[in-house]
């Protein structure tokens, strides 16, 4: 008899959704400086678009300041332009091969907008988790229909898949609440 559904594989896929969510919310700017803020920035370099961290070193020298050290002097202008055009509301100050980026205080409107974006990311992750759950439930129904597992085993595994889904979604909610608190903190 087959086991019906690979719970480890479902857990791995659900954990992937959590990892993607953590990465998404890490790029949201809060009151404190973080190199992750510049993750979405891509630079036109050497004939293609590259992530900023592949053409420069990003550090956090102060609580409200980022420092970007561009490796190739000819790329400084492109890096500055990419940061300005990134819709992050940042204005880099060029200092030789370095760019200093002061992070402005977030106003209430911008904070609420960031919280909304965080909620969108959370919803996207929850949908991904529910798709994984649906795939698992479909596999269980097929295994039961094909006679690979009995009705009782199918029901038991179905409950395990549901519990796993509930746990992952509550973890996403917890991460969202933490990020929301961090964003709204003045």
UniProtKB/Swiss-Prot annotation:
- CDD domains recorded for this chain? RRF
List, alphabetically, the SUPFAM superfamilies matched. Ribosome recycling factor, RRF
Q: Which GO terms describe its biological process?
A: cytoplasmic translational termination
Q: Which GO terms describe its molecular function?
A: ribosomal large subunit binding
Q: According to the UniProt record, where is the region Disordered?
A: 135-164
Q: Report the subcellular localization.
A: Cytoplasm
Keyword Lipid metabolism annotated? no
Q: Name one GO cellular component term.
A: cytosol
Q: Does the keyword Nucleus apply?
A: no
UniProt-listed Gene3D superfamilies: 3.30.1360.40, Ribosome-recycling factor
What the protein does comes down to: Responsible for the release of ribosomes from messenger RNA at the termination of protein biosynthesis. May increase the efficiency of translation by recycling ribosomes from one round of translation to another.
* HAMAP family the UniProt entry points to: RRF
What does the sequence similarity comment in the record state about its family?
Answer: Belongs to the RRF family.
Question: Under which name does UniProt file this protein?
Answer: Ribosome-recycling factor
Q: What is the lineage of its organism?
A: Bacteria, Pseudomonadati, Pseudomonadota, Alphaproteobacteria, Hyphomicrobiales
């Amino acid at each position: 008899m087959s086991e019906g559904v690979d719970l480890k594989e479902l857990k791995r896929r659900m954990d992937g959704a959590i990892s993607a969510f953590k990465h998404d919310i890490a790029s949201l700017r809060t009151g404190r400086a973080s190199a992750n803020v510049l993750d979405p920035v891509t630079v036109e370099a050497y004939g293609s678009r590259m992530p900023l961290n592949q053409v420069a070193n990003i550090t956090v020298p102060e609580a409200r300041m980022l420092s970007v050290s561009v490796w190739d002097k000819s790329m400084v202008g492109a890096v500055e332009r990419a940061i300005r055009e990134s819709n992050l509301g940042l204005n880099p100050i060029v200092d030789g091969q370095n760019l200093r980026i002061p992070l402005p205080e977030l106003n209430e409107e911008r904070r609420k907008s960031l919280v909304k974006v965080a909620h969108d990311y959370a919803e996207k992750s929850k949908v991904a988790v529910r798709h994984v759950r649906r795939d698992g439930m479909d596999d269980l129904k097929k295994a039961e229909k094909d006679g690979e597992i009995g009705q009782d085993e199918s029901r038991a595994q179905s409950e395990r898949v549901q519990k796993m889904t509930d746990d992952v979604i509550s973890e996403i909610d917890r991460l969202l609440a933490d990020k929301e608190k961090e964003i709204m903190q003045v």
